[in-house]
Structures are given as C-alpha cells and as structure tokens.
UniProtKB/Swiss-Prot annotation:
Belongs to the QueA family. Transfers and isomerizes the ribose moiety from AdoMet to the 7-aminomethyl group of 7-deazaguanine (preQ1-tRNA) to give epoxyqueuosine (oQ-tRNA). It comes from Sorangium cellulosum (strain So ce56). GO terms for molecular function: S-adenosylmethionine:tRNA ribosyltransferase-isomerase activity. It catalyses: 7-aminomethyl-7-carbaguanosine(34) in tRNA + S-adenosyl-L-methionine = epoxyqueuosine(34) in tRNA + adenine + L-methionine + 2 H(+). Monomer. The keyword Phosphoprotein does not apply. This is S-adenosylmethionine:tRNA ribosyltransferase-isomerase. One of its GO terms (biological process) is queuosine biosynthetic process. Coiled coil: none annotated. It is found in: Cytoplasm. Pathway: tRNA modification; tRNA-queuosine biosynthesis.
Amino acid sequence: MRCELLDYELPEALIASRPPEERDGARLLLVDRGRRAGEVEHAAIRDLDRYIERGALVIVNDTKVVPARLFGRKRGTGGQVELFLLHRLDGAPAGAEDLGGGPQESAPRSERWRAMGRASKPIRPGSVLDIERDGALVAEVLERAEDGVLTVQLSSPAGLSVAAAIDAYGHVPLPPYLGRGDDASDRERYQTIFARVPGAVAAPTAGLHLSPGLVERLRANGVEIASVTLHVGLGTFQPVTVDDLDLHPMHAEVYSIPDATAGAIAGARARGAPVIAIGTTVVRALESAADPARAGLVQAQSGETRLLIQPGYRFRVVDALLTNFHLPRSTLLALVFAFAGRERTLLAYRAAIDAGYRFYSYGDAMLIRGVDAP
C-alpha cells in the first residue's frame, strides 16, 4: 500500500486532550460495511448495548498501563534527564511483581531494563541517574545501542521493590500529540476498567469507553465478555515514514490468548454469534492467534506478534470492531482501512470531522459492523 493513501486532514482543534467527563460519555459513529460508503449514523457510547446483539461475544484487552516515564538528574552534573521504560530484559511485563498487588517482600529491588533516554546531552554508559532525590530509584546506564536505546539497571536503595518505586514515582505515558503532561486524573482515565496485567506503555484506547454500568447492561442483554492481553508498545506511536507500507518495520508486541477466551470464541461460532473486538489491539492479538486448521477459531497461546494488517488482509476471527479515530500515516489507520475499506473509512472520518467528533486516544469512537459489501 502506498503510504500517501494513509493521509487525511484533521483540524487540530478536534484532537481531544482530555477524556469526556464520564467514561462512557463519548460519541459513537456507526458504520455498516454492508451499506453504501458514506452512510453513517450518529449515536453515543453509553447506548452501545443497543447496537450489539444478544449472544454476541465482546473481547477486551486487559493490559495495564505502567507509569513508564521517569524524570531525574544525572549524578555529578545535575543535568535533567527523562527515561521512558520499554521492557524488562528478562521478558517479564513492566512491574508485574507488585503493581497488581503481589507481596513486596518477594519483589526484586534491582532490575535490568531497556529504555529510551532524553537529556540535553547524550546519556552515555556509566552515567548514574537519580530518579528521586531521596534515592528511592536509581538508574545506572550499562549500554547505549546505535539506535539510542539504553540498557539500564534500576535499583531501589530505599527498600522499595523496583515495581513499587516505578508505580510511586513514574508518570503516565500520555501520547505526545496530547501536548501536555500527565496529572492525577490520568492514573484512572488512561486505564481501562479491565486493566489487570501490567505491561503496556500506551492504553488500548477503545476500551477506555466502557464503564461498569455499560458492561453491566451488555451482560444483562446476553452479551458475553472475554479478554485477551496485548501489551501496547511504544511503536504504536511510530509514524509510517516509508513510501510503501510493506517496508515499514513493524514493532513487536507481547500477547496472550487464554483458554477461556479461545473456548468463548468456539462457543460464539457454534451459536452463530459475532466476535466483536474492542480496539485494534484485540484485533492484532486474535488474528495473530487464528487457528490455521479451523476457520474462525483461535489457538490459546502466548507470544510476540509483528502482524501488520493493511488492505488486502483477510480477517479470520473478528466480525465487528469498536475503535477510536486514528492518526494519519499510522498502522492503526491501515488496519481500519483493511477492515472497513479505505473509501468507507475516509468518508466516515469526514462525517465525524464535519460533526465535530473528537479524535485520538481520549476522543470519540466508531463501531464498524455488518457483512463486508462485495
């Protein structure tokens, strides 16, 4: 796909810098793949239960966003520095030991991480960074790769586990296009109500819309809800800079499909019910685990995916998609093009812009459903 086809114009005023007052207070654009491109309906997220049929299977992402931005100073010079944690080198998700409530005594007080660093001068191996003046968290730079990614040893001399120190002193990694720093409210609102498994450095944004009340109404209407885990990585912010999308170096993300969810999908297929993905991250996880021998089913598995979905891709698992409005020149927009068609998607985006919908992570959403028109 030529990447110029991923462009569209968006007024800056429509970029949502804050979430709606209520979690389910966003607007909802309804797009039917079986209708003529450009035909849309305007609705509200709080009424989502009206548009999902009884017996449907809704699948959410239960990843938990880690406060991955750390601010401190270089020991000796006092220069300001920022670290953006990417992942632990032992492969464990960020802060897995006790951000989820595990015992402090068993959690490690020293961990090796990959991180991005930013300072007025390059951060070199041997540098020691004091994240907090009281010594609660210290980062020693061990290596610097050619691409600038650092290997750091995090330790907590103050007696906290590293995970607890990150949780206490880290900042929510808001997308750069929001144009602001995080505040206390982002700890709750940049996290879905399903967040359970720490490891993401960006939120699965479609899931941000689902409130406890909305979920309760869905279940009362006979809708089944299951979960997968896909830890959203920093690459989700990476713009497409190549001319041909096939040449884009797709980032890797860790995912897991539990047995219960694989079974729920099999049950939905048996009763002829649709599988509805809450967000593009769920789509990537499910399609990465699609069972090659059994149409429409998935294999319960864990792994790493670099799946790049673009027009021409044949979806094997997902029947409908709730998703936010995405950045131009992004792989997320390419995925939506693949699911709904480029013309239909761009006409829907134009309708949303004309109606003043809010875009991106804290913005409004669209529900894409219906059988794809020939």
